[in-house]
Amino acid sequence: MLTFCFSIRKNAIHAKEEVFCCVEAVKHPSCARDQGFSTLLIAYMRFVLVGIVFRRRFASKMGLENVSAGNTSSRAGVVIVADDLTGACDAAVAFSCQGVETEVVLNWRCARNSSAEVVAIDTESREIPVQEAVTRLESVSRQLDLKAFVHIFKKVDSVFRGNTFDEIATTVREFPSDLAIMAPAYPALGRTSMDGIVRVHDIVGERTFAVWDRLHAAGLHPRHIPAGRTSEEVAGALRVSLQEGHRFVYCDAYSEEDLHAVVRGGEKLEVRILWIGSAGLAHALALNMSSDIGKHLSFRPGQVPRVAPSSGIVVFFVGSDHPVTQEQMISLRKQTNVIEHSFEAPLSIKTKFIGPLVVPVRWGYTTERDICSAMEGLNQEDVSCLFITGGNSATLVCRALGINSLQLQDEFEPGLPCGVAVDGPFAGRTVILKSGGFGETDVLCRIAKTYQPDSHRKIEDAH
């Protein structure tokens, strides 16, 4: 506390000296002709002085002040910036699966307070106006000392929802890097890229996204590296791009091997790289960390801390209307003794304990108070697992339950990051998140069976 007070006093002294110089200039004889103006200006400057001291005190308490270059050793090795919570977890879990301490924070302003080696930040910018999303990214760049991180990763939605391309343009412009590499493919989940076109194959069917054209529309004109190249070929193409003054490159990827080649090729250059992609690129990056990265991160493959399922119920917060999620819900209703909460007719506490509890979340309608009402009477020991689907829903639910950060562990299955609530009434309980389009049809049933075994109804019993 004494150190804090001394720091504030020191800042105030410096600010006072700056204002004093301005006041002396105003008192110069050439300004004496307008004493009223001088008096007013001096009063204004005194007001500014108070504001400077207050802002610095507030920034220090909230962890918003920039960190000097000499403090870089205290920062995390990797920072991930995503536009929603599930996206942040999708990318960050790639590192926790390798045994690296990884934390996802809901409030990016508090990110620098984390001691984790990998920190993921949710800017909550997917569903807001473009200019506001741009402003939030500019704030991240300004308030966090991004140069202190070994790698910067901008997570983009694998089907490019929200303000994806405006955020990419802002990131390339604002975030410190020598080279920006974009590789949005996620082959493990049926998302590939050829000739600047991303093809998505899932339960909905097959769709294509002309990424190249949309990048051009956002004012970006990247160099292109086709799929099927070796890491040496990728490195060579990147070097040529840099030599010719092009610091933004788009890489196709049709397979996992293509993504690995992109990462290995990028690391051969030994320059600061801004990575832009989906969780597929994050996994490739985590699996191909060089010795240089190893100096900053503690990789412990196979030593991921796990929390064993505890007694209690599984609560499914369903905030996605994606067809994949709807199919998963149909399967859950058929195979478990599921209890569905209605905000119009709340369930009794005793009823809730019969089976997994499903709480519908409608973005723009469901409030934090509604979430708290659905969980009324349930304590930490009553809950084994919290499952949340839908990015905006995840943020809403976590805030309602007092969860400000998640310590990630691994994936329940690809695309379903699994972690532990760090704080709030449900601290220590497992939290599983899922983007709407991810997961096999029976994944919710398997979550219920894992974390609430007695809830599972045999298929023959359902007839």
Model-derived regions: residue spans:
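Short acidic, glycine/serine/threonine-rich loops at helix termini
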Residues: 91-93, 163-167, 191-198, 260-265, ...
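Short hydrophobic alpha-helical segments enriched in small aliphatic residues
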Residues: 12-15, 23, 32, 48
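Short, flexible loop segments at boundaries between secondary-structure elements
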Residues: 278-287, 294, 299-302, 309, ...
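Short hydrophobic targeting helices and cationic amphipathic motifs
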Residues: 35-38
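Short beta-strand segments
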Residues: 81, 120-122, 154-155, 181-185, ...
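Redox- and metal-dependent alpha/beta enzyme cores, enriched for Fe-S-associated oxidoreductases
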Residues: 304-374
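Cap/lid and interdomain-hinge subdomains that line or gate substrate/regulatory clefts
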Residues: 74-78, 101-105, 109, 117, ...
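Conserved, well-ordered active-site substructure
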Residues: 383, 392-443
